[in-house]
């Protein structure tokens, strides 16, 4: 059975979690600390006696802030740190029960699907060495069929046996060495490969679960069957490894452990929750549906049973983190019951010019570093001066102030426009060094920034 430690909560301390988030996200320390504490509380709860553990409920978080300030990025990075089943969903994907669209219980099903997939991959990693040996033997069997030896003069199928000779063993050892050195990757072999019956079934919105069950039912029809296929060794190896791993992995244990992990350590991030909030000054049928989504979310967040194809999960101890810009609405416009289920509220700050400068230089995978590495593949050395970084940050900030504020996403637009010509010409400029300074930035973007109409459509 999968180890109990595979999906336990992350053992990182809040300080370590914040330090890890700092490597990728600039600022927003309050949000980082709240998320870090919530994540650590998952671990703390698992250390309690079982009777008390069941009484400790997660403190759900509501993150409030304009677009492009890091809400979604915090969720994305959290997924890699959590060491637990994690799913991110858009609130706008769901509709009230009775309307066309996905119902909120799909969140629970998605969480279990994620956990099962992760557990299955972990189980396959544990048997990787063993299945690679099995796959190697099957490839060698295809390359060197064993000689059939009959007993007596009348050869009967029942008395034929496979008898490797010393010469065969030497040949097999030689081919094994060639196989491991990669000399036979393009050699074609014939194999019996398991048949995977798959059907593409189109289902109406909101009935994806039924379509998935139908696909699974039809796939089971061909279970156990195999067919002969001619493949190169390079193409055959991953197929054989997957096939052998499936034989060694216990699906029942994986499903049971995945459901347990979801119930005890699952984390759900609900983005764009402000889009399902009814505005106080509007009246209309669409707002009824939005409020209905909130009411459908309520039992899920409070704690309910959700039926999935792997079994029923209880959502009582799942941590929910919701986020939204709340441009046209306020968190107080959420239905009161749902407000009470998100006791921790965190406001993320709008980004300043100084933040943009840090975003361009500090993160491990800063945008400037990404462009430098991309152009390096073409043999072009790209360098950004400090005054160039300052000017790029200033332009992004000014355009955000003048138009819609889209936060750090504006930097993507500005940099792409700035380096468009260089990216186009880079295959013909192998070996060159290009320095981007303030003059370079002004030459390529200055006119666009001065003309509000142009910047509105281009930047």
Curated annotation (Swiss-Prot):
SUPFAM superfamilies: P-loop containing nucleoside triphosphate hydrolases
The UniProt record lists the keyword Oxidoreductase: no
Primary site of residence: cytoplasm
Matching Pfam families: AAA, AAA_2, ClpB_D2-small
Top-level taxon: Bacteria
GO CC annotations, alphabetized: HslUV protease complex
Keywords: ATP-binding, Chaperone, Cytoplasm, Nucleotide-binding, Stress response
Keyword Nucleotide-binding: yes
Record-level Gene Ontology MF annotations: ATP binding; ATP hydrolysis activity; peptidase activity; proteasome-activating activity
Family annotation (InterPro entries): AAA+_ATPase, ATP-dep_Clp_protease_ClpX, ATPase_AAA_core, Clp_ATPase_C, HslU, P-loop_NTPase
Binding residues annotated for ATP, in chain numbering: 26, 68-73, 271, 337, 409
Signal peptide: none
Compartment annotation: Cytoplasm
Annotated Gene3D superfamilies: 1.10.8.60, DNA helicase RuvA subunit, C-terminal domain, P-loop containing nucleotide triphosphate hydrolases
BP GO terms, sorted: protein unfolding; proteolysis involved in protein catabolic process
Self-association state and partner proteins as the record states: A double ring-shaped homohexamer of HslV is capped on each side by a ring-shaped HslU homohexamer. The assembly of the HslU/HslV complex is dependent on binding of ATP.
Function noted in UniProt: ATPase subunit of a proteasome-like degradation complex; this subunit has chaperone activity. The binding of ATP and its subsequent hydrolysis by HslU are essential for unfolding of protein substrates subsequently hydrolyzed by HslV. HslU recognizes the N-terminal part of its protein substrates and unfolds these before they are guided to HslV for hydrolysis.
Family: Belongs to the ClpX chaperone family. HslU subfamily.
Protein name per the record: ATP-dependent protease ATPase subunit HslU
Protein source organism: Xylella fastidiosa (strain M12)
């Amino acid at each position: 059975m999968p180890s109990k430690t595979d999906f336990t909560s992350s053992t990182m301390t809040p300080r370590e979690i914040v330090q890890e988030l700092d490597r990728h996200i600039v600022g927003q320390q309050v949000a980082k600390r709240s998320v870090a504490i919530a994540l650590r509380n998952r671990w703390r709860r698992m250390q309690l006696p079982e009777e008390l553990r069941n009484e400790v409920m997660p403190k759900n978080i509501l993150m409030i802030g304009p677009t492009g300030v890091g809400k979604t990025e915090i969720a994305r990075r959290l997924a890699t740190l959590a060491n637990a089943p994690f799913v991110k969903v858009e609130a706008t994907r769901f509709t009230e029960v009775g309307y066309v669209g996905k119902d909120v219980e799909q969140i629970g099903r998605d969480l279990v699907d994620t956990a099962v997939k992760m557990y299955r991959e972990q189980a396959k990693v544990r048997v990787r060495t063993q299945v690679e040996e099995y796959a190697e033997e099957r490839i060698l069997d295809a390359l060197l069929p064993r000689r059939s030896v009959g007993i007596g003069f009348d050869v009967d199928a029942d008395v034929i046996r496979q008898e490797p000779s010393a010469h065969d063993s030497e040949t097999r050892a030689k081919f094994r060495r060639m196989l491991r050195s990669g000399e036979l990757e393009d050699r074609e072999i014939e194999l019996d490969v398991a048949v995977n019956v798959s059907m593409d079934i189109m289902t109406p919105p909101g009935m994806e679960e039924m379509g998935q069950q139908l696909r699974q039912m039809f796939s089971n029809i061909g279970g156990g069957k195999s067919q002969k296929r001619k493949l190169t060794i390079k193409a055959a190896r991953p197929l054989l490894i997957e096939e052998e791993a499936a034989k060694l992995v216990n699906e029942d244990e994986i499903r049971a452990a995945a459901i347990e992990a979801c119930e005890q350590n699952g984390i759900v991030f609900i983005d764009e929750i402000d889009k399902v909030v009814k505005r106080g000054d509007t009246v209309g049928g669409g707002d009824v549906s939005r409020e209905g989504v909130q009411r459908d979310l309520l039992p899920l967040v409070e704690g309910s049973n959700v039926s999935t194809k792997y079994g029923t999960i209880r959502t009582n101890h799942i941590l929910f983190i919701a986020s939204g810009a709340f441009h046209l609405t306020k968190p107080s416009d959420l239905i009161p019951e749902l407000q009470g289920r998100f006791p921790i509220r965190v406001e993320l700050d709008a980004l300043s010019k100084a933040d943009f400068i840090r975003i361009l230089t500090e993160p491990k995978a800063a945008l400037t570093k990404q462009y430098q590495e991309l152009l390096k593949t073409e043999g072009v050395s790209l360098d950004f001066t400090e005054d160039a970084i300052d000017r790029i940050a200033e332009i992004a900030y000014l355009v955000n102030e003048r138009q819609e504020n889209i936060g750090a996403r504006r930097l993507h637009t500005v940099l792409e426009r700035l380096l468009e010509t260089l990216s186009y010409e880079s295959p013909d400029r192998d070996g060159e060094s290009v320095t981007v300074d303030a003059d370079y930035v002004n030459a390529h973007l200055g006119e666009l920034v001065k003309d509000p109409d142009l910047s509105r459509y281009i930047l």
